């Protein structure tokens, strides 16, 4: 066993901490115990740059004294530390204002089935082997082409995690997961200047990752294709978001449909249930029980059972992303999303990105976005971008130093196609997205 505590030990600690909270005057309480360990190594130009070992554990206890809430945490699991942490949470609760929405999620909503989602796969990787993998990855990148003249390094990471959540409804559950990754970033140069790019792969099972040599070669190829970038004339063009950035585009939709933004009136999609936000040929599903996915779970951060569902169906919003607190604020019921969304799937309309390029004809393929120019309240969108100019459905040349702008509401409704090219490594399966028109500012 890699961890210092067995699942049964963490469950006992959780139950004991909740008992201490009740004995100390809490009318309700919830606690989570977590433990993690892993290692990260990085090399640059064949030399070891960093070796890091990580081992952490923590307890977070939240208590409710009537409608008053207090929270405290510790990394010490000793009896005295548990008592002190519970006391600190109780003391905080007694000094906070009452909140009608504070409290546990309804007992009837607690998960009753908790199966194995196959998310835990140990990687017994020695430090020496990790260094060798990183070197193989970097060397594959450097040997791809003589124009790859420098490296920002290659890294290998392994992470192992376990987590127990429990509350005074009597709910308690354990889950564990792993997260492994290999990455590489290199620099290429020619008479026109220098460019950098990167690539990585990650999985909860290391056997599912691409070989380090392929990751390095992909990083090099992505860097080389950016050489001799130029700008484009300012105008309105179709814009194709590569799958690597399309995930973020849909991420703004998720944020706008999240309870915190909605009850604070800081979303451009307030009161959007039953309203159209995407074209009628698109639907967005949440699938919390996918095997070997980072975001899979049978219960959320409040113990509420998760369920497969449509968030957007045929373009129409069917649900939000709500915790019990945000749901109470909105007069609704939690959707089992305390802690965030779980595995989102956007259906595709085209088989490949190449099909979307042909559909687009002439326009911009975006592969990188920069800056934080997104207003979640108004939907205004303006970001620096880099990618490729496309003519007659074929990539013509790389572009940089441009800005793309629009309103997210319009951009979502103006989607005309989605490719079936989502990356396996992503828990949100979002393919490349073609938007019919945006303002592109160049030279």
Region annotations inferred by a language model:
Residues 1-297, 301-304, 313-314, 394, ...:
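Active-site bordering "gate/hinge" segments
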Residues 114, 270-443:
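Dual-mode signal for accessory low-complexity, basic/Gly-rich regions
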């Amino acid at each position: 066993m890699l961890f210092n505590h067995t699942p049964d030990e963490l469950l006992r600690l959780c139950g004991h901490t909740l008992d201490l909270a009740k004995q100390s005057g809490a009318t309700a309480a919830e606690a989570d115990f977590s433990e993690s360990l892993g290692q990260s190594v990085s090399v640059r130009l064949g030399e070891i740059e960093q070796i890091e070992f990580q081992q952490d554990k923590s307890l977070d206890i939240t208590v409710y004294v009537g409608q008053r809430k207090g929270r405290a945490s510790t990394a010490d699991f000793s009896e005295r530390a548990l008592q002190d942490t519970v006391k600190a949470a109780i003391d905080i609760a007694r000094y906070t204002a009452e909140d009608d929405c504070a409290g546990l999620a309804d007992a009837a909503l607690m998960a009753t089935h908790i199966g194995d989602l196959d998310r835990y796969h140990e990687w017994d990787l020695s430090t020496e082997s990790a260094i060798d993998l990183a070197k193989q990855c970097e060397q594959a990148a450097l040997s791809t082409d003589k124009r790859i003249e420098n490296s920002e390094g290659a890294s290998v990471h392994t992470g192992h995690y376990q987590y127990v959540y429990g509350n005074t409804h009597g709910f308690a559950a354990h889950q564990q997961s792993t997260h492994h990754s290999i990455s590489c970033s290199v620099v290429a140069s020619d008479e026109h200047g220098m460019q950098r790019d990167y690539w990585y792969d990650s999985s909860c099972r290391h056997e599912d990752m691409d070989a380090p040599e392929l990751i390095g070669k992909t990083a090099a190829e992505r860097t080389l294709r950016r050489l001799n970038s130029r700008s484009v004339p300012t105008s309105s063009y179709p814009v194709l978001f590569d799958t690597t950035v399309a995930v973020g585009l849909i991420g703004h939709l998720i944020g706008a449909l999240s309870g915190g933004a909605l009850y604070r009136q800081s979303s451009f999609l307030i009161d959007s249930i039953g309203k159209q936000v995407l074209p009628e040929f698109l639907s967005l599903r949440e699938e919390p029980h996918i095997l070997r996915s980072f975001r899979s779970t049978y219960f959320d951060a409040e113990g509420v059972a998760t369920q497969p569902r449509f968030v957007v169906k045929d373009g129409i919003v069917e649900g939000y992303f709500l915790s019990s607190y945000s749901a109470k604020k909105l007069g609704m019921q939690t959707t089992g999303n305390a802690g965030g969304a779980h595995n989102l799937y956007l259906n595709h309309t085209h088989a490949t990105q190449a099909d979307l390029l042909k559909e687009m004809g002439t326009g911009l393929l975006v592969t990188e976005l920069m800056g934080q120019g997104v207003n979640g309240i108004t939907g205004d969108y303006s970001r620096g971008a880099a990618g490729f100019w496309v003519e007659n459905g074929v990539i013509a040349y790389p572009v940089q130093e441009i800005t793309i702008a629009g309103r997210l509401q319009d951009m979502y409704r103006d989607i005309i196609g989605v490719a079936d090219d989502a990356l396996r490594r992503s828990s949100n399966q979002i393919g490349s997205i073609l938007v019919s028109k945006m303002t592109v500012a160049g030279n």
